[in-house]
């Protein structure tokens, strides 16, 4: 018997998540002095000064002790920031862990998990790994205000008696598209209470469009809704791996039964507590991203590319031809972007909105790739 056959049926059907290139590994492989990393939607401004100070003050001798398993100080800080009950908060080793934990906790083999076509890759992986039947719902057409966005009518039609979990990212990664308040509210009313709706708001802090709802406001009206957020993006703490979910306390209590003990380390807890309280820093990050996102959009469009609307810290660009050669040529010039072939978008690349000089460097390299390397 092959070892793989010893795995559960869901795991046997599973492909590992592709996190993209490690910048240092690819730099050494290509023999380049440095790499410009614009493939993972990280925050070039980094964490706030208050977070940096908190981490400087931590004694490394603390590393011999287990962290607070309940992360009470951090949960209280998150609760205070969003006006929720601390018992409604579940912490994860990144929101990725929470998305998987929700499937592991609530889904049984034979249940259906509904998610949009071009939704975050982890949705499908979590569904398959839990032994569920993944129901991938066709997206909106490319022509329209929300190209390749989640189709609310199709998502509603996909709901059935076996639906146990619904995943939706707002704004969506990788398309950058979103549902407005009315669309999301109408959808939530139609979801039976026998199913849990997970709204992933990893990019919430970057939103500057007023019609994009804060899902926490809607979640308070629906006991079967869970909102996930992360400290990896706008808060600049990707390396510390920390995210959180907010739901009704009863649902959060069930998640506590399956959440790994000590899944959030001591340093991540301290940094995140400082980060969530620094509202001014997050606003500076949002404003800087909004400005640079439009600069980058204009530059990409000037190169003749179709650029999807976005409320995140990234842009999806369609090259109208296979994008893999473009990605490879950019790598040789020291620039990392994210290919979208795995999402069924082989003509597209997702590009993180960087700092001003990073965006200038990307546009210069891309122009040379299109007009020289691949001309």
PLM region spans:
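PLP-dependent aminotransferase class I/II
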Residues: 70, 224-308
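Conserved PLP-binding catalytic core of the aspartate aminotransferase-like
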Residues: 141, 290, 299-333, 349
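N-terminal small-domain helix-loop-helix segment of the aminotransferase-like
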Residues: 2-96, 101, 373-375
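PLP-dependent aminotransferase-like
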Residues: 105-168
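PLP-dependent enzyme catalytic core of the Aspartate aminotransferase-like
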Residues: 329-338, 342-375
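Active-site pre-lysine segment of PLP-dependent enzymes
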Residues: 128, 145-161, 174-197, 201-234
């Amino acid at each position: 018997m092959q070892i793989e056959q010893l795995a559960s049926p869901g795991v046997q059907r599973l492909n590992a998540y592709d996190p993209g290139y490690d910048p240092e590994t690819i730099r050494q492989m290509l023999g380049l002095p440095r790499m410009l990393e614009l493939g993972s939607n990280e925050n070039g401004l980094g964490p706030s000064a208050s977070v940096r100070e908190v981490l400087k003050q931590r004694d490394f001798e603390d590393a011999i002790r287990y962290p607070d398993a309940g992360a009470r100080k951090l949960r209280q800080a998150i609760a205070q920031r969003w006006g929720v009950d601390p018992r409604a908060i579940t912490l994860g080793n990144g929101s990725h862990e929470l998305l998987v934990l929700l499937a592991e906790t609530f889904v049984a083999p034979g249940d259906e998990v509904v998610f949009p076509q071009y939704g975050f890759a982890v949705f499908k992986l979590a569904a398959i790994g839990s032994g569920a039947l993944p129901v991938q719902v066709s997206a909106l057409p490319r022509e329209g205000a929300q190209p390749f966005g989640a189709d609310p009518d199709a998502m509603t039609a996909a709901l059935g008696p076996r639906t146990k979990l619904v995943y939706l990212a707002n704004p969506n990664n990788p398309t950058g598209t979103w549902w407005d308040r009315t669309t999301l509210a109408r959808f939530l009313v139609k979801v039976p209470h026998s199913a849990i709706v997970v709204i992933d708001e990893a990019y919430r802090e970057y939103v500057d469009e007023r019609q994009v709802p804060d899902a926490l406001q809607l979640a308070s009206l629906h006991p079967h809704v869970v909102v996930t957020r992360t400290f990896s993006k706008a808060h600049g703490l990707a390396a510390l791996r920390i995210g959180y979910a907010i739901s009704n306390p009863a649902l959060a209590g069930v998640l506590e039964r399956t959440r790994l003990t000590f899944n959030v380390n001591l340093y991540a807890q301290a940094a995140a507590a400082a980060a969530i309280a620094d509202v001014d820093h997050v606003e500076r990050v949002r404003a800087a991203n909004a400005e640079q996102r439009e600069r980058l959009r204009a530059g990409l469009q000037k190169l003749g590319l179709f650029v999807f609307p976005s409320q995140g810290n990234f842009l999806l660009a369609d090259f109208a031809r296979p994008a893999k050669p473009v990605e490879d040529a950019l790598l040789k010039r020291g620039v990392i972007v994210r290919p979208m072939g795995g999402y069924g978008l082989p003509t597209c690349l997702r590009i993180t909105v960087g700092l001003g000089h990073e965006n200038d460097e990307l546009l210069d390299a891309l122009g040379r790739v299109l007009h020289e390397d691949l001309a």
